[in-house]
Amino acid sequence: MEMKSIRLESINPEENRARFYVLYVTKTLWNTWALLRRWGQIGQEARGVRMDECATEEEALQRAAETIDLRMRHRYMVK
C-alpha cells in the first residue's frame, strides 16, 4: 500500500508551545483514498486523530495541501 506523509511542527519556548501535526495520504482496503491527520504535543502520544475518506488520490492530496496551508498560517513549519 502506498503512503505519503508530512510532519509539521510549531515550537515557541516563549509561549510554551511544542506541537506537531502529521498528515498521511494512503489508499484504503476498499480502493478509496484517505487523508489521516494526527496532532498533539511533541514528545507525547497524539491527542487527536481524524480520517477523511476521498474518492481519488488527487482529492486527498488537495485536502492535504489545504491543511498544510492552514497549519503554516498558524506558525507550523515542515520538518
Q: Predicted regions span which residues?
A:
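Mixed-charge, Lys/Arg-enriched low-complexity segments
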Residues: 1, 46-79
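Short N-terminal "domain-start" leader segments
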Residues: 1-34
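A broad, low-specificity signal for short, low-complexity segments enriched in glycine/proline
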Residues: 11-15, 40-41, 70-74
